[in-house]
A protein has these predicted regions:
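Composition-driven recognition of glycine/serine/threonine/acidic- and proline-rich low-complexity segments
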Residues: 2-191
Length: 191
């Protein structure tokens, strides 16, 4: 087995580079993307799309009438040095010294024996039902010190794949220890 095949791969959301922890290497940097919030169907996962895509052959597919759509992600909040509608960067990271990488919601520290790669806040699309956009999106851990993409125009509202911070709702989620309306943290840990 080659050296580069050992370890774990994870994505740092909201940053243009990987954390310099335990020999972490950047596999590639990219643009956070996913399906548009207003379209039914399609994928539910958020992707880190490379800056230098390889195009599909010109004869595939023969019709684009029934294609799913990929949009870049936009922040739908202001925090630190990012602003509403800024585009979201990402970096895919390889950690040779780890066999597992885990995102833990509602925590800012890792369990004993695990190493923190980064911590931040849960984000996802806002499915409040105000516009009848009932569909699924994944939750991702946005870095606590997020960047914005410098390519293109800042704060250009495309309203494609949009990211909102996540808050706790009491009921089946017990309060305490959770608090109604409180933003939910997250941490990415390796072992």
């Amino acid at each position: 087995m080659a050296d580069q095949d050992v370890g774990s791969v994870y994505t740092t959301w909201g940053r243009k580079s990987c954390p310099a922890i335990n020999g972490t290497k950047t596999v590639y940097t990219g643009i956070t993307g996913g399906k548009p919030y207003h379209e039914m169907g399609g994928g539910v996962n958020t992707l880190c799309l490379p800056h230098d895509p390889d195009n599909a052959p010109s004869n595939f597919p023969t019709s684009q009438e029934s294609a799913a759509h990929m949009y870049g992600s936009e922040y739908q909040f202001t925090y630190g040095n990012i602003a509403w509608d800024d585009d979201v960067p990402c970096a895919v990271c390889h950690l040779k010294s780890a066999t597992s990488v885990l995102m833990i919601p509602a925590k800012t520290t890792c369990p004993s024996g695990w190493t923190m790669q980064y911590h931040g806040y849960l984000v996802t699309d806002n499915n409040d039902g105000a516009h009848n956009y009932w569909h699924a999106f994944d939750f991702i851990c946005l870095h606590s010190d997020p960047n914005y993409l410098t390519e293109g125009a800042r704060q250009h509202n495309m309203d494609g794949h949009i990211l909102f911070p996540v808050t706790a709702v009491c009921g089946s989620l017990p309060c305490p220890p959770y608090k109604a309306g409180q933003y939910i943290t997250c941490v990415v840990c390796s072992s």
